[in-house]
Amino acid sequence: MQLKIKEIFNQDYVKLEGQKIQIKAWVRSNRDSKKIGFLVLNDGSSLTNLQAVYRVDKIDNYEEIAAARMWAAVVIEGVIKLTPTAKQPLELEVLNAQILKQSDEDFLLSNNDLNLETLRLNAHLRPRTNLFHAIMKVRATLAFAVHEFMNQNEYSWLAAPLFTGNDAEGAGETFSIQKFDNEEFFGKQTHLSVTGQLQAEAYAQAFGNVYTFGPTFRAEKSHTNRHLAEFWMIEPEMAFVDLKGMQDIVEDLVKHVIKAVLEKNQQELEFLAQRNDENLIKKLQKVVESKFERIEYKDAVKILADAVKNGHQFENNEIFFGMDLGSEHERYMCETYHQGPVFLQNYPKDIKAFYMKLNDDQQTVASTDLLIPGVGELVGGSQREDSYEKLLKRCQELKMPIESLQWYLDLRRFGYYMSSGFGIGFERLVMYVTGVNNIKDTIPFPRSHGQIEF
């Protein structure tokens, strides 16, 4: 019978002893001593490798198999033998072996001294390392868990467009589409989308609860370990939900996806804990078990100012109401002051996007950021402005192109009572759950300023 390596190690070994099985896998290493050889095999189903022992008196093509190089594709038939005194609990005694495809001698990963930067430059090969195998397995679980949560809570998935005539964030950091045959293909200047939020609001007013989950683009000339030009966003939008209700949903979603990884990726998390952060699993368990604190922006400013007065040093020690908090301030709030996930809420309107609902104080908007230890901001969200007049006034204050946003304004004219939504940078979530330090290591083929290989 044909088995995956994961299936072999996930069942009772005793029942497998003496059974004849077939494995299709790649060679991780191969050593021989003329009469006996040892293949270390992996088929991608698990971080655990399977050792296969081949002997010159058991197979006809011993020399051919002895020449199998690292990452050669092979098919092996053999008998399971228990090895209770060895490092691995069992091995495969080879009866038949065949090289399906040999690997060239200059295979990059045969060099054990490769650093992460070299692997980023060879992103087509890095999934063959244990590190990126573990990261991408966790990423896959997180993505599935997002869809699972949304499906269980009756959200409809929306395929948001990637071409847009709007800049929803108003930051101007968009990729423009080139003219086609010396004319605007869509009849107007067009960009790659930075968010699917505006379109999600339109559908939330008909479906109630919707979400987008797909790629977005931002033309930031940033070379930090926290920025990508192409990244994935999770963007739910809920009708008849206020800021507090939206925060409850954020908390439930974050806990759900982290719990899914704790349940399904124990092996990967143990490997990542050894590689990146020895407290990784405890950190994730604490998030699942904790209650997310909620703190007013104005109170956070006072807390930070008091910290400076008491001798704490930030790179930016000028703390005042109206400032856009930096990562160092956000991390202080969730790592030092609260020591756990915390929502900051009701930010000044001048540092937030145009579509956020103006509070009664006329100074702040119904907005929130979820701050997570080790990352800072993970989630940003708000209750949306439901007044046509107030939204129009805000657009005019910011000198935004009213004509291209008229459809969005018009939503308020047709029963738009209340709507709230949030965005989660998926790669930042993967960073947090895996403990990696560079966001370029959380996406299969990273796109950033000056990098477009593969």
Swiss-Prot record:
Q: Where are the transmembrane segments?
A: none
Q: Which UniProt keywords apply?
A: Aminoacyl-tRNA synthetase, ATP-binding, Cytoplasm, Ligase, Nucleotide-binding, Protein biosynthesis
Q: Where is this gene product found? A: Cytoplasm
Against PROSITE patterns, the record matches this protein to: AA_TRNA_LIGASE_II (PS50862)
Q: Known EC number(s)? A: 6.1.1.22
Q: Which Gene3D superfamilies match?
A: Bira Bifunctional Protein, Domain 2 (3.30.930.10), Nucleic acid-binding proteins (2.40.50.140)
Task: Report the enzyme's class at the first EC level.
Answer: ligase
Name the GO terms of the biological process aspect.
asparaginyl-tRNA aminoacylation
One Pfam entry for this protein is tRNA-synt_2
Select a single GO molecular function from the record's annotations and give it: ATP binding
Reactions mediated catalytically: tRNA(Asn) + L-asparagine + ATP = L-asparaginyl-tRNA(Asn) + AMP + diphosphate + H(+)
Q: Does the keyword Nucleotide-binding apply?
A: yes
User: What S-S linkages are listed for this chain?
Assistant: none
Recorded family membership: Belongs to the class-II aminoacyl-tRNA synthetase family.
Subunit relationships: Homodimer.
The UniProt entry, under PANTHER family, shows: ASPARAGINE--TRNA LIGASE, MITOCHONDRIAL-RELATED, ASPARTYL/LYSYL-TRNA SYNTHETASE
Protein name per its UniProtKB record: Asparagine--tRNA ligase
Q: Which organism is it from?
A: Ureaplasma parvum serovar 3 (strain ATCC 700970)
